[in-house]
Amino acid sequence: MLEFKHVSYHYPATPPVIPDLSFKIEKGEFVALAGSNGAGKSTISRLSNGLLLPSSGEVTVGGFNTKTTRASQIARKVAFLFQNPDRQICQNTVREEVSFGMRVQGFPEEEIKARTEAALETFSLNGDWSPFTRSRGERQRLALASVLAGKPELVILDEPTTGLDYKECTAIMDHIAKLNREEGLTILMVCHDMELIQSYAGRVLVLNRGTLLGDGPTRQIMKDRELLSKARLRPAQIPDLALRLGAGFEDVYTVDEMAALLQKRAGHKEGEE
């Protein structure tokens, strides 16, 4: 679905932000791109959707080279959800906002109407609302509805839960995870929050200064304290606690697993007494 082949990128008169990067994301994967500030996450996300073109190397999306494919064709395959929803909201009503991207891409009018109404229903949005009078959580839901209405094959999420409370965060991420699980939507989530990554991503790419330090299943990456330290990332709490507790806790990964093991150990102690 998305492949980087020896990609480098540099801004004019500066050293490379991305020196030499290669990775591949298959259709239907939920992948997190993790790194601290300055790791190159934003540059990679913009290279992934064709907003930036590589200085050298090749980026392909669904088999199409971003350097040689029309931007409109890439836009039909890749959707981008900004960290701040206000960066993409520009229409007077919610309905106009959801339909705007599809109209720009040249979708037939009847299809635009059908997809818009379906998106409004899915995300419980009133099409007549003004986007600028809604809460941050509602605006983020609107931005996501707009992104998904065009049925992209790959969605890039840039720190998608920044500024949201726990309830709003869970609602949005659960919906994204459901689309990934049930419809095979490919997700690339740019994120530094390891708790969020642990909860949703199946695989993690760990970056530091544009270099790929690690690539593997989330469970494996979460237990590699040396790797996370090199990338200046704070470990998720439960896997880190399990590593600190040592023998017998090595395989513990979630709150439920930790609770089950502690309960089991407590039961053994009661039996011994």
Regions inferred by a protein language model and the residue ranges of each:
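Catalytic Walker B motif of ABC-type/P-loop ATPase nucleotide-binding domains
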Residues: 155-158
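The feature captures the beta-strand-to-loop junction immediately N-terminal to the Walker
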Residues: 34-36
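A short, flexible loop at the N-terminus of ABC-type nucleotide-binding domains that lies
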Residues: 1, 8-20, 68-70, 109
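Conserved ABC ATPase "signature" region
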Residues: 110-127
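Helix-to-loop junction immediately C-terminal to a conserved catalytic motif
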Residues: 49
